[in-house]
């Protein structure tokens, strides 16, 4: 239901429609040998971009990331030619339980699981993937923060200079929750 509300076409493998549906969430896709079966394989722009590991409502998602990461690394060869890959794996990894959703963006400099409140729309993942392909050295906001040029000291008061410096250092060190 959350996927449908976000604009995804949720379907079985035989019902996938890459032509008329922009974002497809395909149920129960068998991954490469030893990588199991992904609950959902996500497609945008006719390309595989991510996986979802779905758990029963109320299940804690702590410790589930290894499973969805295994799916992201196990995309079958037949899908790889057109897939969006980062370090030989799908970049967008989700775990969901109906009450909480975790998300990992593989394009981030130090990818890690983050709690999100809603599934992103297909257009959002497509934009992130396009931005990453267009600028591989700084594919995401977090990567661009790491590469910020030093700010000119302009005409700031001393306390403002300290505050701006502290904010930039915090962002660069990823000391933020979103």
Regions found by a protein language model. Name each.
Residues 1-178:
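ATP-dependent helicase/translocase motor core
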């Amino acid at each position: 239901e959350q996927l449908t509300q976000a604009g995804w076409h949720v379907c079985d493998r035989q019902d996938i429609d890459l032509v008329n549906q922009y974002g497809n969430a395909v149920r129960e896709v068998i991954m490469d040998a030893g990588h199991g079966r992904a609950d959902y394989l996500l497609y945008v722009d006719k390309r595989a971009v991510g996986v979802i590991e779905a758990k029963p409502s109320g299940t804690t998602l702590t410790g589930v990331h290894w499973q969805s990461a295994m799916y992201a690394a196990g995309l079958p060869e037949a899908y790889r030619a057109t897939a969006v890959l980062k370090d030989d794996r799908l970049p967008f990894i989700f775990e969901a339980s109906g009450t909480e959703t975790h998300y990992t963006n593989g394009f981030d400099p130090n990818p890690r699981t983050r709690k999100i409140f809603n599934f992103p729309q297909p257009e959002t993942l497509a934009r992130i993937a396009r931005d990453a392909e267009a600028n591989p050295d700084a594919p995401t906001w977090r990567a661009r923060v790491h590469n910020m040029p030093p700010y000119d000291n302009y005409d700031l008061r001393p306390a403002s200079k300290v505050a701006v410096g502290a904010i930039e250092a915090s962002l660069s060190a990823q000391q933020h929750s979103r």
